[in-house]
Amino acid sequence: MPGTMIFIDTDGHRDERTLKAAPKLEELQKMVGGYIQLVPLFSRVAHSSGMQKCVVLCNEDGKNLNMPLNREATRLWQLSAGKAPIQDVLVGPIVILFGDPSFMEAL
């Protein structure tokens, strides 16, 4: 069940890890700084291994907490949405997850 997790901080710094199993909820919450929310229309991401179907998570209360804008994550979100216009921005750190079918199902 191999998978990949990419963490993108608000300064654009990326940390990519290969995972043997889906991360635990508590780990994801710690990474985004609170309760997680699925980012709508962010379902694919370009990776060195090609375009990948993905799940992207952010802090569900990030805007109310005045978390800083995440320009890189917002740019990737707009690319993922294709022709669907995104009239919003992502704030705070985000987590991108993708992998084989069993990894994705475990999320």
Question: Which sequence ranges carry the predicted segments?
Answer:
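Domain-length accessory/inserted modules outside core catalytic folds
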Residues: 1-107
